[in-house]
Regions:
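Active-site anion-handling motifs in enzyme catalytic cores
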Residues: 1-347
Length: 347
């Protein structure tokens, strides 16, 4: 977790960079048009966040057909915020990409989110489903206080949580919020059908990892006795991707899921990608509650299985058993939840 000094340093640095940003005419053609901005759009290599951005824009295009959906990459936030503010009217809609970064673990993104909310005080703002986690460190407590102060002051802000722990925490700090699934769960990427073979392992190797290297090695060895085992992480080494590049990367990983007999993962969107492609999946917990919390939305689909205890024998047994597929039933429930968001934000 970041120290208070580091958080303050980055906050001041971001504010100065935004204040001294050079003017740009890139958005001038949008002046006078009805716009829906997608702020903090993921143009970096986390395909989970990229998928959230994609799904959010798809949903907005259906719900607000009379609005132009404007993708604002997170990498352009500081340099373009003033220009965007100047071309927006009070009738334009501001949306903020969902995810798992309302925290001091990814404090730089949380600082940017607060800057966006402050910049558009006269606009309707929708913050798509988030996982919230602030540590008990001095830095975490400060950022949590800033979040409460910033978000509670806005008169037309809709905040949404994607699991019950975040929802309850938001309520505890007096934020009015909705409980909704991760927006990626609204997608259907089960087509085109392809022949399935082998197992895809999608496992973390970062600060949220919880599986030991020895466990992963032994699991791979056991699985390799009966299956071809491939690796495909939801994190790729790319920055500053265009919208077309993002969609290409998403199609590649969705195709990988569709062509696998099983996906084994400890990544939230590894689990969700398996769900939306109709792929049997075993998912392990990570070092926070977001996987367990989000799994509750899809636990009855019949082909995605959360294993709280990482036991290799149990994994092998589960893979050997048949699965059912209740995607359509669960998908209808998930999509019905977002009707609530549409009603709340159209008032």
């Amino acid at each position: 977790m970041a120290s208070l000094v580091k958080i303050l340093y980055i906050k001041i640095r971001f504010c100065l960079k935004c204040f001294f940003a050079k003017s740009t005419s890139v958005y001038d053609s949008l002046r006078g048009k009805k716009k829906c901005l997608v702020m903090l759009a993921a143009d970096y290599g986390n395909l989970g966040d990229v998928a959230i951005t994609y799904a959010q824009e798809q949903w907005l295009a259906v719900q607000y057909p009379e609005y132009e959906i404007v993708d604002v990459p997170i990498s352009k936030t500081l340099s373009h915020l003033k220009a965007l503010k100047n071309i927006c009217s009070s009738t334009d809609i501001i949306t903020i990409v969902g995810g798992g970064n309302m925290s001091d673990l990814y404090f730089d993104i949380e600082i940017l989110r607060q800057m966006v909310v402050k910049a558009f005080q006269n606009n309707r703002i929708i913050s798509f489903p988030q996982t919230l986690f602030f540590s008990d460190t001095l830095g975490g407590k400060f950022l949590k206080w800033m979040a409460k102060r910033t978000y509670s002051k806005h008169k037309n802000l809709t905040i949404t949580a994607r699991e019950i722990w975040s929802f309850n925490t938001m309520k505890q700090i007096s934020l009015d919020c909705l409980l909704l699934p991760d927006i990626v769960m609204t997608l259907d990427k089960s087509e085109p059908k392809v022949e399935r073979s082998g197992i895809t392992m999608c496992l973390r190797n970062d600060k949220e990892a919880s599986l030991s290297k020895d466990f992963v090695h032994e699991l791979r060895e056991r699985l390799s006795l009966d299956f071809a085992v491939a690796d495909y992480d939801t994190h790729i080494d790319k920055e500053g991707m265009s919208v077309a590049e993002r969609e290409q990367e998403l199609e590649m990983i969705w195709t990988s899921c569709r062509s696998s007999q099983w996906v084994i993962t400890d990544r939230l969107h590894g689990m969700i990608f398996a769900f939306i492609t109709g792929t049997p999946c075993i998912v392990f917990p990570n070092n926070n509650y977001k996987i367990e919390g989000c799994y509750k939305w899809i636990k009855d689909c019949g082909y995605v299985f959360y294993l709280g205890e990482c036991n290799i024998d149990d994994i092998i047994k589960r893979i050997g058993k048949p699965v059912t597929n209740k995607y359509n039933e669960i998908s209808n429930i998930i999509n019905s939840k977002f009707i609530q968001l549409q009603k709340n934000t159209s008032q």
